[in-house]
């Protein structure tokens, strides 16, 4: 029987318990860890029918452990809820299938965005708007952003909305996509840049917000066989982590899809994997390790990474995170 996978919180707890820190400092760190562990991330995905919300969710997160449910009132809610313990995904129905249906969906989106969590803050931390990069008619999505999301989120809209341009592989009807290397050629790459530039300008014109769209491909399968691997998913994940509160970033670590192929291809404009690790480290430092004694050695070797390699202040706790992130996204 295989050993049950430990959560990032359990690994961090073990690191602290096995450290040479004074007992009082251990207790303080464990208390802080309990606070961090209680934080839950809520992400909402919205978009037109066929934009690829479900494929994006499945590509990014480990949905095998998701508990499927609905909103507070199962009788009336049409927004699907996927509960992955510290991460909750709210998947809204696709827009564009009828005026009355769209009104019903937007009404529920507004209601959900107005909900408050137990801490009195907005329940939804982030809204990811998925657009179809191959579509010339994005009017429904612009209406959603301009007339629903921005008014509902108010002054926090710019930091709580991410725009994803999915289906980059078929943006030019399947042309100029290098299947062997799983990336666009220069022609398609320029097309996608212009598409993103156009969407960005249109949103800024309508709302005043400067939101940079991320072109990506969630990947897909047909008849059980994979037809296209994900592309630029690392860039989208990095954007999500950057835009959720720092104290909640650890919640994503346990729920990242473990298929390394999903994180193997991107535009290489930045090292998104390394940037993601740094953002997670910031979260660990902010939430747990303020004031750690220089030279404290937490954990010795965990997941094959010596604590002192990272440095005395962060020690093996960050080593834990390094190991987990590397095992998921690759070195």
What are these regions (language model features)?
Residues 330-331:
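Extended, hydrophobic alpha-helical membrane-active domains that insert into or remodel lipid bilayers
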Residues 1-88, 93, 98-282:
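Conserved GTPase G-domain substructure that encodes guanine base recognition and part of the catalytic core
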Residues 278-327:
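Small-residue-enriched transmembrane alpha-helices
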């Amino acid at each position: 029987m295989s050993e049950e996978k430990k959560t990032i919180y359990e690994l961090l707890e073990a690191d602290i318990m096995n450290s040479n820190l004074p007992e009082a400092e251990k207790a303080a760190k464990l208390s802080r860890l309990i606070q961090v562990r209680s934080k839950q991330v809520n992400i909402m995905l919205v978009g037109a029918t066929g934009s690829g919300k479900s494929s994006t969710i499945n590509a990014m997160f480990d949905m095998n452990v998701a508990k499927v449910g609905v909103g507070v009132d199962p009788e009336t809610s049409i927004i699907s809820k996927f509960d992955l313990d510290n991460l909750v995904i709210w998947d809204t129905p696709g827009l564009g299938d009828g005026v009355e249906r769209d009104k019903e969906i937007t009404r529920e989106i507004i209601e959900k965005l107005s909900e408050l969590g137990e801490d009195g803050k907005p329940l939804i931390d982030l809204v990811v708007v998925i657009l179809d990069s191959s579509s010339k008619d994005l009017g429904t999505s612009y209406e959603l952003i301009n007339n629903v999301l921005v008014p509902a989120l108010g002054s926090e809209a710019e930091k709580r909305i991410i725009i994803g341009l999915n289906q980059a592989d078929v943006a030019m009807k399947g042309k100029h996509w290098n299947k062997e290397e799983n990336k666009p050629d220069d022609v398609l790459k320029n097309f996608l840049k212009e598409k993103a530039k156009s969407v960005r300008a249109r949103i800024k014109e309508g709302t005043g917000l400067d939101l940079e769209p991320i072109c990506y491909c969630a990947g897909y399968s047909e008849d059980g066989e994979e037809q296209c691997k994900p592309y630029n998913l690392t860039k989208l994940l990095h954007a999500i982590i950057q835009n959720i509160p720092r104290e909640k970033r650890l919640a994503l670590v346990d729920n990242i899809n473990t298929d390394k192929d999903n994180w193997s291809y991107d535009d290489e404009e930045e090292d998104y994997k390394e940037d993601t690790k740094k953002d997670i480290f910031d979260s660990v430092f902010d939430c747990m390790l303020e004031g750690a004694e220089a030279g404290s050695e937490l954990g010795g070797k965990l997941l094959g990474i010596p604590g002192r390699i990272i440095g005395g202040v962060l020690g093996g706790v960050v080593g834990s995170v390094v190991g987990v992130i590397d095992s998921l996204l690759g070195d």
